[in-house]
Swiss-Prot record:
Alphabetical list of PROSITE patterns matching this protein: COV_M
Subcellular location(s) per record: Virion membrane; Host Golgi apparatus membrane
InterPro entries in the cross-refs: ALPHA_CORONA_M, M_CoV
Membrane disposition: Multi-pass membrane protein
Record gene name: M
Organism: Porcine epidemic diarrhea virus (strain CV777)
Name by which UniProt lists this protein: Membrane protein
Length: 226
């Protein structure tokens, strides 16, 4: 056209393509967020974690770019961009500090899961089991079904005997470790079926790495970030 304007049909076509692209992106994002749980799909969970980890540096880079673009042009935008960059950087640093502190207690890479700040740990058949939880619960239940052990609904081991159920479990947070002692159980040794219930007994600066005994040894009591 002579006046240099963009034809309406071309604008509609670009909007249609743009809308279709965003429809695909948002649908994929919706599926990842809804079903990106470790119990449902390890692959979707990995994609979800990658998205969460990428968001911090991406938002920080966008905030710094906005600050550079707004410098001496729009001081209000510049101030807000600097503020958002500082908030993002602070959240990023806090995430790494708390994750490292949690890792020192559990020695598990679940410590770097950005979805939670608490890990339930116990020892089963000499193997350390670590499960992310949303918070420190009032009580913890271990369920044994025909020799298959479930911890808070997670399948963690098979071929487990009733006598191998631990005497305590721990829930580690960045600032403390909560020890749960066994207060009751109902088991059928012949079928390898039953349950054990644990409640809070104490908390402190303990290592969350546990053993099947009822007493925390001196080697399990370690100081962390102070």
């Amino acid at each position: 056209m002579s006046n240099g304007s963009i034809p309406v049909d071309e604008v509609i076509e670009h909007l249609r393509n743009w809308n279709f692209t965003w429809n695909i992106i948002l649908t994929i994002l919706l599926v990842v967020l809804q079903y990106g749980h470790y119990k449902y799909s390890v692959f979707l969970y990995g994609v979800k974690m990658a998205i969460l980890w990428i968001l911090w540096p991406l938002v920080l880079a966008l905030s710094l770019f906005d600050a550079w673009a707004s410098f001496q042009v729009n001081w209000v935008f510049f101030a807000f961009s600097i503020l958002m960059a500082c908030i993002t950087l602070m959240l990023w640093i806090m995430y790494f500090v708390n994750s490292i502190r949690l890792w020192r207690r559990t020695h598990s890479w679940w410590s770097f899961n950005p979805e939670t700040d608490a890990l339930l740990t116990t020892s089963v058949m000499g193997r350390q089991v670590c499960i992310p939880v949303l918070g420190a619960p009032t009580g913890v239940t271990l369920t044994l079904l025909s020799g298959t052990l479930f911890v808070e609904g997670y399948k963690v081991a098979t071929g487990v005997q009733v006598s191998q159920l631990p005497n305590f479990v721990t829930v580690a947070k960045a600032t403390t470790t909560i020890v749960y002692g066994r207060v009751g159980r109902s088991v059928n040794a012949s079928s390898g079926t039953g349950w054990a219930f644990y409640v809070r007994s104490k908390h402190g600066d303990y290592s969350a790495v546990s053993n099947p005994s009822a007493v925390l040894t001196d080697s399990e009591k370690v100081l962390h970030l102070v």
